[in-house]
């Protein structure tokens, strides 16, 4: 793969950037097309609901539902070059964290899956972070953290904002 790491390393596309095939001949007229907009597994349900013209559920069996995360991908079906709509996505697995925001990816890896668990779900101020511009660096190979320290700090703050809002930490 063009990616260095694996699924349990949140923020590495080796575990989070996977191909998807959607077949819907009555709607998608351009067979074999490729879409490059950022998407996440949490976009699947909103896409299916929009395609079926169904509302997001607010109550199921008398239980109020937490609003769904994700963005319908239907907009890409008719326009492969459409402007990206899923602009922010956080990642966290066993203390490894990442944040995608407007084409940039920041991540910190505190433990690799093949190591014995030393730190589970911890956040430390000294965790080293990397920064990547995914619009020109598909495989996350050119760390720009030293070149753009202000952007990295903003990305780290964005991760914390998303993590708190979504009860990750």
Regions flagged by a language model, labelled:
Residues 17-20, 41:
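Active-site neighborhoods of enzymes that stabilize oxyanions during catalysis
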Residues 137:
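Intrinsically disordered, low-complexity polar regions and short flexible loop motifs
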Residues 142-150:
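Active-site-proximal N-terminal segment of extracellular/periplasmic enzymes that hydrolyze or transfer
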Residues 153:
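Substrate-binding clefts and catalytic carboxylate motifs of secreted carbohydrate-active enzymes
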Residues 161-163:
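Type III/flagellar export substrates
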């Amino acid at each position: 793969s063009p990616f260095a790491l694996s699924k349990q390393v949140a923020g590495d596309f080796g575990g989070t950037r996977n191909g998807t095939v959607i077949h819907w001949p009555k709607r998608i007229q351009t067979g074999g097309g490729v879409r490059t907009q950022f998407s996440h597994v949490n976009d699947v349900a909103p896409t299916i609901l929009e395609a079926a013209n169904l509302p997001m559920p607010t109550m199921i069996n008398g239980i109020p539902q937490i609003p769904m995360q994700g963005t319908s991908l239907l907009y890409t079906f008719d326009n492969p070059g459409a402007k990206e709509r899923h602009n922010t996505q956080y990642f966290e697995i066993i203390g490894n964290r990442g944040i995608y925001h407007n084409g940039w990816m920041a991540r910190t890896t505190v433990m690799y899956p093949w190591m014995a668990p030393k730190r589970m779900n911890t956040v430390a101020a000294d965790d080293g972070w990397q920064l990547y511009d995914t619009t020109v660096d598909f495989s996350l190979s050119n760390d720009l953290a030293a070149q753009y320290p202000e952007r990295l700090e903003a990305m780290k703050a964005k991760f914390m904002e998303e993590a708190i809002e979504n009860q990750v930490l």
